UniProtKB/Swiss-Prot annotation:
Signal peptide: none
Subunit note: Homodimer.
Protein's name according to its UniProt entry: Succinyl-diaminopimelate desuccinylase
Matching HAMAP family: DapE
Catalytic residues as annotated in Swiss-Prot or TrEMBL: D76, E141
Length: 383
């Protein structure tokens, strides 16, 4: 069994449903300290939601003049769902038919193990490496993400820590290992719209104001609006309604209020304040009496096809013979926080088809190649 597969299994065996770390970061820290890293654990969050974060760094021979490459990821996993639906225990790593099963196998404990072993191999073969290597690991990525990477980035910025490159181990591959790198993510802006009406007996509509009827034209306009056209990196901004609620449950009462939950996934062609203003104008022009609670989940970020993406492309090509694709599709990630303090941020990892699913798994034969890709990226950028 390879060192990478063995460490992956050890990490999967740790029960680490958000915000628990389950001992994963301790395993990682000990491995890194053994090869010369300075490691620091930072616990944050309220007593009922304690988050564990790990920062580790090994300075290169060039000191502060050298480049800094950071591996970033998360040790927390989503809940298992019904245990009886799993073919094997989700926290007992199990190899079956060429697949490694377990919660977090794809998202993202295989990547974490690959980071560590790639770094061990790199440091052994390049003891005088010029650039520095860093790790930023959290146990609060799958949850609220209020006490994880975001506070660690603020901490690093406060201490003046420069970052040049960051590889996040999210599972980005689609059909085969290496076919996709995420070099950016769309922003996320959510809102809860409350439209005021007047409750009344449904037989006397003249005595009430039905907020569903009043809102229908405006909602239709929101759905049909082209918010932007996107660009070479991003699809056009999308507006989606996720929940609609009105009424008392009785079929003879005009509701007094309509509540609509919605979300924008927006490109760099739009700014949050522009989207808010345009949406509110449509509602005001419709004569609605309303209020909205807004939540900005993250701003979009993009890393062009520069040094980091280029090095990762070459590493993938050398290991898999695949010409990879750069993409910004998918949901938000902790890259939205890291991009504020790091020049180049990309995400790359194993196949994502089973992430968060029952019987989550990775292809066993992908584990060592993934590690090799990370190591070859280090060799190109900081050796």
């Amino acid at each position: 069994m390879s060192a990478t597969l063995k460490l992956t299994e050890a990490l999967i065996a740790c029960h680490s449903v958000t915000p628990a770390d389950g001992g994963c970061q301790d395993l990682i820290a000990k491995r890194l300290q053994a090869i010369g890293f300075h490691a620091e654990s930072v616990v944050s969050g309220p007593e009922n939601f304690q988050v564990t974060n790990l920062w580790a760094i090994k300075k290169g021979k060039a000191g502060d003049q050298g480049k800094v490459l950071m591996f970033a990821g998360h040790t927390d996993v989503v809940p298992t769902g019904p245990l009886e639906k799993w073919t094997s225990d989700p926290f007992t790593p199990t190899i079956r038919d060429g697949m490694l099963y377990g919660r977090g196998a794809a998202d993202m404990k295989t990547s974490l193990a690959s980071f560590v072993v790639a770094t061990e191999e790199f440091v052994t073969t390049h003891p005088d490496h010029q650039g520095s290597i860093a790790f930023l690991i959290t146990s609060d990525e799958e949850g609220p993400a209020n006490d994880g990477t975001v506070i660690m980035c603020e901490r690093l910025q406060k201490h003046g820590q420069r970052l040049d490159y960051c590889v996040i181990g999210e599972p980005t591959s689609v059909n085969t290992l290496g076919d996709m790198i995420k070099n950016g993510r769309r922003g996320s802006l959510s809102g809860k719209l409350r439209v005021k009406g007047i409750q009344a007996h449904i037989a006397y509509p003249h005595l009430g104001q039905n907020p569903i009827h009043l809102s229908a034209p405006a909602i239709s306009a929101l759905v049909e609006t082209q918010w932007d056209k996107g660009n070479e990196y991003f699809q056009p901004t999308s507006f989606q309604i996720s929940n609609v609620h009105a009424g008392t449950g009785a079929n003879n009462v005009i509701p007094g209020k309509l509540v609509v939950d919605f979300n924008f996934r927006f490109s760099t062609e739009s700014k949050p304040e522009q989207l808010r203003e345009r949406l509110e104008k449509i509602l005001k022009d419709a004569g609605l009496e309303f209020e909205i609670d807004w939540v900005l989940g993250g701003s979009p970020f993009i890393t062009g096809d520069g040094d980091l993406a280029g090095a990762l492309r070459k590493a993938i090509k050398a290991e898999t013979k695949i010409d990879t694709e750069l993409s910004t599709t998918g949901g938000t990630s902790d890259g939205r926080f890291i991009a504020k303090i790091c020049k180049e941020v990309v995400e790359f990892g194993p196949l994502n088809a089973t992430s968060h699913k029952i019987d989550e798994c990775v292809i066993v034969d992908d584990v060592v190649p993934l590690k090799n890709i990370y190591r070859k990226t280090l060799e190109q950028l900081i050796a």
